[in-house]
Structure formats: structure tokens, C-alpha cells
From Swiss-Prot:
It comes from Cryptococcus neoformans var. neoformans serotype D (strain B-3501A). It is an enzyme of class 4 (lyase). HAMAP family: PurE_classI, PurK. Transmembrane segments: none annotated. In the C-terminal section; belongs to the AIR carboxylase family. Class I subfamily. GO terms for biological process: 'de novo' IMP biosynthetic process. The keyword Disulfide bond does not apply. It catalyses: 5-amino-1-(5-phospho-D-ribosyl)imidazole-4-carboxylate + H(+) = 5-amino-1-(5-phospho-beta-D-ribosyl)imidazole + CO2. Keywords: ATP-binding, Decarboxylase, Lyase, Nucleotide-binding, Purine biosynthesis. This is Phosphoribosylaminoimidazole carboxylase.
Amino acid sequence: MAPRKTVGILGGGQLGRMLTHPAALLGIPLLILDSGSYTPAKQTLLPPPPHSHPDGPFTSETHIRKLASACDILTVEIEHVNADVLEAVEKEGLCEVQPSPKTIRLIQNKYDQKKYLAERGVAVAPFEELPANPTEEDFKAIAGRLGLPLMLKAKTLAYDGRGNSPLKSASSEDIQASLKFLGDRPLYAEGWAPFVKEVAVMVVRNKEGEVQSYDAVETIHRESILRVCLTPLRGEKGVNQRARELAEKAVGHLEGAGIFGVEMFLMPDGELLLNEIAPRPHNSGHHTIEACLTSQFENHLRAILSLPLGSTALRVPSAAMVNILGASSTMDAIDKMADNALTVPGAAVHLYGKAESRKARKMGHITVTAESDAELNERLRALLFAQPDAHADWIDLIAPPSPAPAHSHAKPLVGIIMGSDSDLPVMHPATKILEKFGVPYELTITSAHRTPERMVKYAKTAADRGLRAIIAGAGGAAHLPGMVASETSLPVIGVPVKASVLDGVDSLYSIVQMPRGIPCATVGINNSTNAALLAVRILGTSVPALNKATEEYSKALEEEVLAKVDILEEEGWDKYIERLKK
């Protein structure tokens, strides 16, 4: 293998630190420019001989040029760099820069970025530029056009909510308060986006313009700081795929190679609006280290070095990331959260090696993976309740607790549906089987004839909501299982219900006689027990613990029968029959 090119990184924080891990595995020499000899990134990888990691500001022209002279490629772990110097370095042939300095400069100015994307057909919230030194009349005029409330945003040097200020009214008091918060910076205004979720997608782009996206994540903030990410994004109307397509479209209009973090809003009507892009690894992609086949950090290096891009697919069905934030100047709370995470199955701790803690500073993160959303919920709750600012109501919104008995789970794997409440006694045994195996489920009524739109919506959204199998009970014409099977990619198990006439044979024939290409499994009449067992076996193909549990269940059935054989042989069949009559 030919020697790898040397990569220089502007910035030596936690993102640079996490870039060093795949660099070491791939044999990629790194040089890191930042002030200090023991920054988070410099702690974890030695520089290639005879060099040392340069010590100095990553915005300094002198230091950037010195770094460029020792590297083949420069990249960034933070966008607040000197784009002019990077452009000059590349033009002079000192070093290649990725992503393109042109892209970095564009993204540094959030107004220019938004204007550029909007002109290329990327969906964004309405926005307008404010003049330099805006007056109160300027604010009132723009409020009249965009409506109130609106969001005032700094064009540059804004992150973690530090460049945003909501303007709730056009009063002098509110305007002056926003100006004081934002300081003397160029501003623009953005129409209010009453989103239902904040979403992010990581996109990797190579030098040829090929883009690949990771599964979308739901990003959950408190006080404008990212606290939790959940993936894959659950929702209706194929929202995960639509988010990926929007992110790929946006990054496709940029220049240069690397990883990009694309933030967006999911609106009440299902529309997605792009918020902003980061030209670097992003907090909303940290889960990819454990949860994906190739992490965002490795793919960034692959992209800028023209190596084959790695798969962005998830390794696991469900994953989350929890930021570890400083609670004070001491490390006590951080150590407590990290130690607690070591007791949570599927959790991986990443501490950033920062020497000083302060309130709300990002000191590390925890990734947690699971075989299902429900399992992830339980693990996530254990992590969140260990945080110093744990708030039960907030945690319950993110990771709902297990439901009360005989109530639907918030994160079900199996859906149990029936056409009428009269079918409930037949379908009830299925719930007991699923509970026995610890499989989260939901139960509801939807009729193929009386509520056809509800049935279609249920079927079409089932997979996006995280369901992996559907048990459908129906009597008489019994169209429900087949109609649901025609509207979903999930396995559907039909339960023929014995109606008042024909003893359920009509239901059986209706369900079992599906046309080719629309499979619908069918069990015996009124046998929801077997339907649930089949659902568990289906889940067991991807969840080893359930596969083992079904084996133990079958073994218990065998032992039960063998015990009866022993009693029959010991007592004789006459006494055995008398026993059965009691």
C-alpha cells in the first residue's frame, strides 16, 4: 500500500480528536493546528516524524501556511477559520484544501448560505436581510412582511443558539433586547418555523460529487444546546428518506469533499425546511461511530483522500447519542455520568479530554445502541436520569416509560389490529404471548370497510413508525389482513375470526386466498396465540434473544407433553380421563 497523504486539521477540539481514531487505523498521518500542546485532538495521535503538531491559532495566516507546507491536504473541524488564507494556500499550490474554501466561506455567512440554497430550489423558511445598523422601523417593516414572532439571526460566528434571538413583538423593548443579545453583527430575519421536530442528516461527498447520506436523526435541544439524538428518524410519509434526499440535494450544490451536517425542521404538515449546513463532522453524527458501518469521521477522511466511501448503513435497528455537558467547574458530574453509562448495556462513553469543565460545555458524549426502539428507550432513560439536571417530564417526552398493563407501548414492534371490538376476545391471547416474550406492541381497531382511510394510513406508516410485524384479525368477509398486506412492506399475519355464521371458515378462505405477490400469513381460526408466536419468530430472525426465547418456549411445550406421558403411563388412561373431567 502506498503511503497515505498527510492531512492537516485546523482545530484541535473533540471533532479533531474523533478524526484521529480512524486516521490511526487507516495509517493516515495527521498534523493538528491549535493553541496548546495538549488539546483534545493532540492527546490521541502522535504527529508523523519529524514533525510536531503546530501550536498556534487556527485562524493565523502564519500558522496556516506553516501547516500547509507540511501537509498534502488541509481540512477543518470548525468552520470559523480564515477562508481567505485557505483560498490563497490552494491557489499558490502549497496544499489542497477540502472542503473547498469557497464552500467554507459560503457556509460561514448563514444569510449567504440560505440565499444560495434557496436560489437552487432547496426548501427553506422565508428570510430577509436587515440593513447595516438597523432601526426600529426596519424591524417593524420586516415583521410586517414575515409576521411575528420571527427569528433574528447573526450572519456570522453563530452556533449553539448563540447567534439567534426570537423577536416576539415589534415593541421597542423587544427589539432592543434582541440587539443587545446579538451584539454589533450583521443580521437577517427568518420567518418563524413552528416545527414539530428538529432533524439532521450527515452527508458525505467525494471529489467527484458523489453524495451518500446517513439515516436522519431527531435532534433534541434544551436551552439551544443539543442534548439527545435519536436514529433512525421515525414518522409518517417516509420522512427519513425525504430528509436524506433534501440533505443530499443541498450538499450536491456545494463544492469540495468531506462530511457535511445538514440541519432542518420538520413542519406540522410533514414538509421539511433546511435550516443550515456545517462543512465538517457534526455533533448529530457522533452516534455513527458505534451505530453505523462507517463513522462520519472515517468517511470524512475517505472523502478528502479520494478513498472509496464507506457504507453509511446502520449496524443496529435503533441508536441514540447523549451529550455529556459540564454542570460546574468540577468534573464530578461528568465522572458520575460516565460511570453510570458503563452499567448500561449497549452504551459507549466518549470523553473529550478537556482540562476544564464549565456549565453547559460539551465534555463528552455517550452512544447507546439497541435491538428495538423500546429497548433503546429503557437504556436511554437510565442515561438521562443520571444527568445532574435530569427532569422527569422532559425525559418522559424523549423516552416514554413502559405503559400501564393492557395499554399500547409508545415504541411498539408489533401491531395488533382488528376490524371490530367484538374481535377483541379472540385477539386478546396474542397480547399475553407478546407480553410473555417481552415484545412491545400496540393494539387498536381499524376496519377495512368502515374506516378504510384509517386502515390505509396505519398500513402505510407502520414501517416508518418502527413496527416490524402486524397481526390482523377479521371475521366474515375478513378483508382487513389482505388489504393491510397490500399497503405495507411488513409481514402481516391474518387471524380468521369465527363469526356468527359459517364457523369462521369463510374468514379463513378470505385471508388465505391472497393473490400472488401479496403475501399474508394465515393461522388457524381464532388462533391469535399462534399469530403472536409467529410474530415473535419473525422478530427472532434479527433479535437473537427472541430466537433463544422461542427455543425455550418450544422446549417447555415438549417437557409439558412428556410430563403428561409419564402421568398417563403411571396412572393409566382411565384415571387420566377422570383427571381431565375435573
